[in-house]
């Protein structure tokens, strides 16, 4: 589970996002009122969920938004609430002591052409994708559109980009860009250390990185999480 993995990584000196695990709403609500109410946070299931029920609030959430995100994430083994790290999520695929690929991830989105409605753009993009990476026009996506004063029927201006999710994950329709040859090698070493710490010969490691070209500095706060 994520919380146990974070404890092991932190003990090994690997940077992890600050946060806590909650299983009961009264405890989470109290923590929200005292700690999280005015901060950018991430709410996600404690068990890995392939990007499902993960909500990122770059703008601090209202109590109503936090309530909904907590209960959507709290379906199995509790909820992790973390401080939101600055930067972009990079997905490292590791086998043995080798990084096979590094993919930059972007949240599910569509780009307008001045003619098609958002729902048509989603269908068009899904037509070129594997079933496992389809964009979803679900309740969460509709909330994201509503927050941007948009509906599935809205026709976007040419070049206008609209995001359907807050979290970047390929399983929820996110975009992927291969940066294996571009990213500084220090982050590959960090990912390998994380996999070794968790004793995983085959691993997928996600790291939020502020600048993929700047070498990793353990003393620099917030450079990688």
Enumerate the predicted regions with their spans:
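Short glycine-biased active-site loop of nucleotidyltransferases that positions the nucleotide triphosphate
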Residues: 32-33, 93, 215-220
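Conserved hydrophobic "DFG−1" position in protein kinase catalytic cores
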Residues: 56, 94, 207-209
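Conserved N-proximal alpha/beta basic substrate-recognition cap immediately N-terminal to
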Residues: 1-30, 34, 49
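Acidic/histidine-enriched active-site and ligand-binding environments that engage anionic O-linkages
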Residues: 32-43
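Phosphate-binding site of ATP-dependent enzymes
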Residues: 60-169
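Glycine-rich phosphate-binding loop of ATP-grasp-fold ATP-dependent ligases
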Residues: 41-68, 89
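ATP-dependent carboxylate activation and anion-phosphoryl transfer catalytic cores
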Residues: 98, 106-113, 166-225
């Amino acid at each position: 589970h994520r919380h146990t993995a974070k404890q092991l990584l932190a003990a090994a000196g690997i940077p992890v996002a600050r946060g806590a695990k909650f299983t009961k709403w009264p405890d989470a609500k109290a923590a929200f009122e005292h700690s999280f109410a005015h901060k950018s946070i991430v709410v996600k299931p404690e068990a890995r969920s392939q990007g499902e029920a993960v909500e990122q609030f770059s703008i601090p959430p209202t109590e109503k938004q936090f309530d909904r995100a907590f209960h959507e994430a709290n379906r199995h083994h509790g909820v992790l609430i973390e401080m939101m790290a600055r930067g972009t999520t990079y997905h490292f695929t590791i086998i043995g002591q080798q990084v096979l690929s590094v993919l930059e991830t972007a949240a599910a989105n569509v780009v307008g052409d001045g003619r098609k409605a958002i729902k048509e753009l989603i269908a068009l993009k899904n037509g070129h994708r594997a079933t496992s990476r389809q964009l979803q026009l679900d309740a969460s996506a509709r909330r994201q559109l509503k927050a941007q004063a948009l509906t599935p029927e809205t026709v976007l201006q040419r070049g206008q980009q609209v995001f359907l999710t807050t979290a970047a994950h390929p399983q929820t329709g996110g975009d992927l860009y291969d940066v294996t040859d571009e990213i500084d090698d220090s982050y590959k070493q960090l990912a390998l250390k994380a996999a070794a710490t968790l004793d995983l010969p085959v691993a997928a490691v996600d790291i939020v990185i502020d600048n993929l070209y700047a070498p990793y500095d353990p003393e620099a706060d917030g450079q990688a999480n």
